[in-house]
Structure formats: C-alpha cells, structure tokens
Amino acid sequence: MTRSITINIAIYEDKTMKIEKLIGDCLREKGRTLAIAESCTGGLICDRITDVPGSSDYFMGGMVNYSNESKSKHIGVPSNDIKKYGAVSSQVAKRMAQGVRRAFNTTFGLSTTGVAGPTGGTKRSPIGRVFIGFADGKKTWVRKLDLKGSRREIKRKTVEISLELFSEILTHKNFSRKKVEPKG
C-alpha cells in the first residue's frame, strides 16, 4: 500500500534553517559527499546547495546535462537507454544519478530529467513529467512526478521536492514507501 505525504513547497521559507543547510550539515556530519546531474532544472539544485557557506566540504560538483549527447558523453548514460526509454524516464534518471556519482567519486549522486514545458510534451512524457534519481553506490532510488504549472513553477517544484526527498534519504526516513503529491 502506498502512503501519501504532502510537501509544502514553502515549508523551509519561514524557518531559521533552510533545507539546503540541513542537507549540508547532515552530509558534513556523516563525512559524505554529493554530485548533481541536472537536466530539466538547469542547475537550480546546484545553486541552492552552493548557497550554503562551506558547501565545498561536501558538494563536489554538478553538471547540466540538457542534451541527450551530454547525458551519454559526460555521465555515461547509454544512448540505447535514451532511445529505448526516452530521455525523460526512470531508467535515464537512474543512470544519470549513478553516472554523476561515479564522475565525481562521491557518496551520493542526484539527478533530474523532465519536461518543464510549455512545449516538448508527448504522450509518453507529458509536460510536467519529471524523474528524480538518487544513487549511493549500493542503492538507486527514482521518484516520478507529474507536476502542474508554468515552466518556472515546474522547475521550482522539482528543486524543492528533490531537496526534500534527498533529506529523507540522508535521515533514513521511509522514502521508498511514500508517494509525493506536491502542493501548488
């Protein structure tokens, strides 16, 4: 049975500590590192992570792998996977997370791939379809989202949900059994 959680996109706005700081503190405390491969979010997650002073202690780097060629060339996503499943798929999100983790030799890899719109949607990958991938060398997690809103809103929601889900992985919350239904 799948349980639902609701993520309030602005939950960290009014608190004294933002989620990117919480993530950074947890990574630093545990001696772990992170690398990020972004497609549909265009570097916005890296921007949030590096807003924290001292983030170079745990954030090794990131890439915007917007084209299929970049996904294959720089982080090792097999072009056959892209052809077979599409660039916006759980398989590609998984490979991106694994590939960026290997490329930067980090504990964790995080990835995003999706269709932010307003054009580019297909029956297989409609506007608002996003996959977020996480890899730690032993396990890989992928979360599928179907978001509504403008291009900017879809990107913003993807960033917030990515950070929230990653914080759950770091704190060993019951990530795999939760279905995310973002507000807004």
Where are these regions (language model features)?
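Short alpha-helical segments enriched in small residues
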Residues: 7-184
